[in-house]
Swiss-Prot record:
SMART domains, alphabetized: RING
Function of the molecule: Component of a Polycomb group (PcG) multiprotein PRC1-like complex, a complex class required to maintain the transcriptionally repressive state of many genes, including Hox genes, throughout development. PcG PRC1 complex acts via chromatin remodeling and modification of histones; it mediates monoubiquitination of histone H2A 'Lys-119', rendering chromatin heritably changed in its expressibility. The complex composed of RNF2, UB2D3 and BMI1 binds nucleosomes, and has activity only with nucleosomal histone H2A.
Encoding gene, per UniProt annotation: Bmi1
Residues spanned by motif Nuclear localization signal: 81-95
Tissue distribution: Detected in most organs with high expression levels in thymus, heart, brain and testis.
Region annotation (Interaction with PHC2) ranges: 160-180
Quaternary organization: Component of a PRC1-like complex. Identified in a PRC1-like HPRC-H complex with CBX2, CBX4, CBX8, PHC1, PHC2, PHC3, RING1 and RNF2. Interacts with RNF2/RING2. Interacts with RING1. Part of a complex that contains RNF2, UB2D3 and BMI1, where RNF2 and BMI1 form a tight heterodimer, and UB2D3 interacts only with RNF2. The complex composed of RNF2, UB2D3 and BMI1 binds nucleosomes, and has activity only with nucleosomal histone H2A. Interacts with CBX7 and CBX8. Interacts with SPOP. Part of a complex consisting of BMI1, CUL3 and SPOP. Interacts with E4F1. Interacts with PHC2.
UniProt-recorded name of the protein: Polycomb complex protein BMI-1
Induction (UniProt): Down-regulated by oxidative stress.
Top-level taxon of origin: Eukaryota
Residues covered by region (Disordered): 232-324
Amino acid sequence: MHRTTRIKITELNPHLMCVLCGGYFIDATTIIECLHSFCKTCIVRYLETSKYCPICDVQVHKTRPLLNIRSDKTLQDIVYKLVPGLFKNEMKRRRDFYAAHPSADAANGSNEDRGEVADEEKRIITDDEIISLSIEFFDQSRLDRKVNKEKPKEEVNDKRYLRCPAAMTVMHLRKFLRSKMDIPNTFQIDVMYEEEPLKDYYTLMDIAYIYTWRRNGPLPLKYRVRPTCKRMKMSHQRDGLTNAGELESDSGSDKANSPAGGVPSTSSCLPSPSTPVQSPHPQFPHISSTMNGTSNSPSANHQSSFASRPRKSSLNGSSATSSG
């Protein structure tokens, strides 16, 4: 399966940094003529003495260059989300500035201009932040009842709550569930958001950004347990071998009944179809005992064992029947 390429923040720096001050964008502002971006204070100060873009020398405006620059909120949000701690440090600098200069006119500015916006309001998540999440079993039957608007049955609340670092990956969460619930390696655990399985390399911060978590409650996650693909392939091979064994035993009995078949047929060493098949997952009540459309319970027609069936053999050309 193709894995998404993850790159370092230093590889994106040319797209996130202002060429005038050498730092990350603060109040990113873009020239509409050439779409080059700078910090607001940097480009305003530069255009006081020049009417051309500092990067490509395109004329911004003949007389009033400030008319052709626009605030770029989308770019600024990207910078805040990609650079750890930048938003928090900038808000602190603004609060400190207005505390040291109470006469500065900040009444006309927004809360963000005054540094009075918290990370939660801006939906900025840092790697070291602790995220509250809920995890519960993904019940397909419950989902079907909800879709069909059936009356829900009395259900046990199996939802659990965790507090984890934002940098924790889905793979770590799967390992935690396997260890906590003693799930054997023959079963696969999928962590899901609503009905969509999540990739192992997703962090909780990635999930919060991708699915626009609003912090109005714990991050809702689900999990399901299912047999691994390898186990399912082995079951298919076992079924094929059993069918081949039945064909072989039938052909052997035909040879015993024929006049030319002087050698008694030998019983197959493959397991008998009448042998009861144990449920592969008795410890997981959530998992159905039916796999690939076939039930694991033995058929009623195969209750009698091969040992109790009469055996036919040929002795001196005469057919004899002996019971086991």
